[in-house]
Design a protein with these regions (language model features):
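Hydrophobic helix-coil surface modules that form long, contiguous segments used
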Residues: 6-14, 21-190, 216, 228
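Beta-strand-rich binding/interaction modules
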Residues: 45-46, 342-343, 356-431
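Hydrophobic alpha-helical and helix-loop surface patches within well-folded domains
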Residues: 92, 121-377, 427
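Outer-membrane beta-barrel initiation region
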Residues: 387-389, 397-399, 405-406, 414-423, ...
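Transmembrane beta-strands of outer-membrane beta-barrel pores
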Residues: 474-480, 491-493, 503-509, 520-522, ...
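Outer-membrane beta-barrel translocator/channel fold
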Residues: 505-589, 641-685, 790-793, 799-809
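C-terminal outer-membrane beta-barrel translocator/porin domains of Gram-negative envelope proteins
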Residues: 563-567, 579-734, 743-744, 751-754, ...
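Outer-membrane beta-barrel "beta-signal"
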Residues: 774-775, 807-819
Length: 819
């Protein structure tokens, strides 16, 4: 606030609000007559109209009949910079506004236009002119035209869009400052001139009355102009390139709905109607000031219909423009115009955290003697918010019938009886997905399904469809199964379910390898709790397992986030021809139960894992406790990473199987079996006779001493180890390439009970001090949206039980980061 602002006196008395990080000052309407005296080199814009002096626009007006680059060359060669001693005096008058803002810059260029009798000004930094020229002026004119059409006549003589140093946007009466040329941002900020500027709410107490309103009108504008995806495709040249040209377009409304639903189900939901500074954090503020009220207004438009909704909004605007508004004045205006009592709708949205979830309980149809069909539709409310529903009946010929079910108030169950002219085959409630119904799966008797290739880097998440993604895959192992081609199918729906089915058939051995796994989240219970399951017969290993995962944080959206998991896995059998090379001990069955806690605090990640064999399900008997911590800090192109692991295994004389002990080098068996190329030992590729690429592959984890990959160093039953890495990176944007040079050191103490003389496990722990150090190279790019990462490390220094040595030929590669 750059000037002393008059406190508003309204029906609640004096509003002497202090400054809060969320929400702006509540202002009183008045006239601002402001005179500026500044160096002439500065071009100025402000709320209001120029009544005296020259703001400098004419001297920097862009001739848009030229290509911008050509015009800038002419401008740079002809523009005469004012002398540093010259001054510019200019006066702006802003009438009937509750705030006044101004912006000045030596680098501004100007473009101007008109919408009816409204002057439209655009000022932008010369360095960003190629993106701003023409488009921002045209977008500004379209935005003010849209707002006048939908809400009412703009009451001021001008509107100005200016550039700003920081990204994002900020609104003032007659003036917005935007950090980018984005059309959606223009519409959003211009919407604020209506909702905040003209209809002046107290943003500290009721931020939703402006943020929610302009968010929803922006969404409707962008969908109206560009389609359901809600953005200008022409601005994204790569959308026409492979593979993006084959990606289905998303739905901007669905994205907003999913965002709200995730927050509503988090266990941290809060009422919309709350002072901005009372929300738990900025995330809760944004969802309750922007997302949720915008979706509330979309639902209101759905209930009233587009025409009545906008007519009612215009009534609200006409009645309260250039005055102070609040929740009651808005609700009263809508009810007054529509003639409907809507407290049941607004109270549930604004003053509770009740959720909407309707479902079809039953669908019965029967033919009548006159050729019509009777339908009995059982509707149930699993949630606690109530709303009328549009019911769509689909017939055999693909045509539909739409009608409203309005027996909704306070009903958890109802039967909707109606007749149709043709035989119905399916029914859907809320077919256009306009409500924030938590779970659409029960809204229809015939859920849509979309089959698509599993494009790398793409995620398609519609509210009203199952998404089935497919991807071919294969195993190839020349020493056993030969080629085993296969297919992976992923079945997904929002945050609630995911199922993966994979099958591979080996022609030579007639073996069928398969995987079935996935997860589920309850809709209404156990917030942020995921139930995982899996079973597979991969080459070398069979496994069955399950896990319950719970995420929790004291303040939603802010670290630390704690993840607590409990699970089990059983490996009943192994194929030694494949399993041994992955570090598995195939001599007996294995069953393990575990508890796991992980958290992140800023740049620090922590994990504690406790595991134990499962009685009769396991031929081994052991208990394991492992604590891992990692740190990653970076500044500009420099990065430092550190990992520390401490762990111990308690077991009997039989010891612990290789897949459950601590590997010195990493290369965890249970991690390696998830990678086809590691299961298949790089498909038999040999560097030279007797030496496979797999002998140089580093899968990070456990001891993580990369210098010991392929050295045959036995594992440990206890360890205290570290990995450190410092690196410097350089991005080559023209080549879409990142290169990173690293120096690393790994080391630790490792204990086991093996008596090397007798090769028998004893009772005394014997320690080994092991370490390595070296240099590395990391390469990162992407091809067709698939991220590609290659790590090459040269651990030339080795310290083992025989002492220290240098090995210039020691090298490892990996497709995973070391820490």
């Amino acid at each position: 606030q750059w000037y002393p602002k008059m406190v508003v006196y309204d029906e609640d008395g004096w509003n002497a609000d202090v400054f809060h990080a969320e929400g702006e000052f509540y202002g009183e309407f008045g006239n601002f007559d402001v005179k500026f005296d500044l160096p002439k080199a500065f071009i100025i814009a402000a709320s209001g109209v120029v009544t005296d002096g020259d703001p400098g626009w004419e001297s920097v007006t862009v001739d848009t009949s030229f290509d911008f680059d050509i015009w800038v060359d002419i401008y740079d060669s002809t523009y005469v910079k004012p002398d540093s001693s010259e001054r510019r005096t200019v006066t702006f008058l802003a009438e009937n506004v509750h705030d006044f803002a101004w912006v000045a810059s030596k680098d501004f260029l100007y473009e101007g236009g008109k919408h009816n009798d409204i002057d439209v000004h655009v000022l932008y930094d010369k360095g960003r002119g190629k993106k701003w020229t023409k488009d921002v002026l045209e977008g500004s004119i379209r935005a003010i035209s849209w707002l006048e059409e939908k809400f009412g006549k703009y009451p001021y003589p001008q509107v100005t869009t200016t550039d700003r140093i920081k990204s994002g946007g900020m609104e003032y009466p007659m003036l917005v400052m935007n950090g980018r040329e984005d059309e959606g941002l223009i519409v959003h900020e211009y919407g604020h001139i209506y909702f905040y500027g003209i209809l002046a709410n107290n943003e500290v107490d009721e931020a939703w009355l402006d943020e929610g309103f302009t968010t929803t009108q922006t969404t409707h504008y962008m969908i109206n102009r560009y389609g359901n995806h809600g953005f200008d495709l022409s601005l994204y040249e790569d959308r026409a390139e492979f593979p993006k040209k084959y990606w289905p377009l998303g739905n901007s409304l669905h994205s907003s709905q999913w965002s709200a639903i995730r927050f509503m189900r988090s266990g941290h939901d809060e009422n919309i109607s709350r002072a901005s500074y009372l929300y738990n954090n900025g995330y809760a503020y944004s969802r309750n000031a922007y997302t949720k009220p915008a979706l509330m207004l979309t639902e209101l438009k759905y209930i009233l219909g587009d025409s009545l909704y906008y007519d009612a909004m215009q009534h609200y605007y006409d009645k309260w423009k250039l005055k102070h508004v609040n929740e009651q004045r808005f609700v009263d205006a809508i009810e007054e115009f529509t003639g409907e009592e809507l407290n049941w709708f607004f109270d549930a949205w604004l003053h509770t955290t009740h959720h909407l979830d309707y479902g079809i309980k039953s669908f019965k149809k029967s033919p009548n003697s006159d050729g019509t069909w009777s339908v009995k539709l059982g509707i149930e409310s699993i949630g606690s918010r109530f709303i009328p529903l549009l019911v769509e009946t689909t017939f055999e010929d693909g045509t539909t019938d739409r009608r409203w079910w309005k027996n909704h108030l306070w009903r958890y169950e109802d039967t909707f009886n109606y007749s149709v002219d043709k035989k119905p085959v399916s029914v859907t409630i809320d077919p256009d997905v306009q409500t924030v119904d938590l779970d659409f799966r029960n809204n229809t008797t015939n859920m849509k399904k979309t089959l698509m290739f599993d494009w790398p880097g793409f995620w398609h998440n519609p509210r009203n469809e199952y998404v089935i993604r497919w991807m071919p895959n294969f195993y190839y192992h020349q020493e056993s199964s030969g080629l085993a081609p296969g297919l992976t199918l992923d079945f997904d729906y929002g945050p609630y379910e995911s199922t993966t089915v994979r099958a591979n058939y080996a022609y030579e051995t007639q073996d069928l390898y398969w995987y079935l796994g996935g997860w589920r989240q309850p809709v209404h219970f156990f917030p942020r709790t995921t139930f995982h399951y899996w079973a597979y017969n991969r080459p070398g290993v069979k496994e069955l397992g399950g896990e319950v995962e719970k995420q929790w944080d004291r303040v939603y959206g802010r670290t630390p986030t704690h993840t607590i998991s409990a699970g089990f896995y059983v490996q009943p059998a192994y194929d030694s021809t494949r399993a041994v090379n992955l570090g598995y001990d195939p001599n007996g069955k294995l069953g393990v139960g575990y508890l796991d806690w992980s958290s992140e605090i800023g740049s620090v990640d922590m994990n504690v894992n406790g595991a134990s064999s499962l009685g009769n399900l396991s031929d081994w008997n052991f208990t394991r406790l492992t604590v891992t911590g990692s740190l990653s800090v970076s500044k500009k192109m420099f990065r430092f990473k550190e990992r520390i692991i401490v762990g111990k295994i308690w077991t009997d004389a039989k010891g612990v199987p290789g897949q459950e002990g601590y590997n010195i080098e990493g290369n965890s068996s249970n991690d390696m079996v998830r990678k086809n190329y590691l299961v298949d030992q790089f498909y038999g590729f040999e560097l030279q006779e007797g030496e496979s690429l797999i002998n140089h592959y580093h899968m990070p984890g456990e001891g993580n001493l990369r210098g010991f990959v392929g050295k045959g160093e036995r594992g440990a039953e206890a360890l205290a180890a570290f990995s450190s890495e410092a690196s410097i990176s350089r991005s080559i944007k023209k080549l879409n390439f990142n290169i990173e040079f690293a120096a690393f050191a790994d080391g630790g103490l490792f204990w086991d009970r093996l008596d090397e003389t007798s090769n028998v496990i004893g009772s005394t722990f014997i320690s080994r001090t092991l370490a390595d150090a070296g240099l590395g190279l990391r390469l990162k790019t992407d091809i067709f949206e698939k991220d590609l990462y290659l790590r090459i490390d040269l651990p030339f220094f080795i310290h083992d039980i025989e002492g220290s040595s240098f090995d210039k030929e020691n090298w490892v590669i990996s497709f995973q980061r070391s820490i």
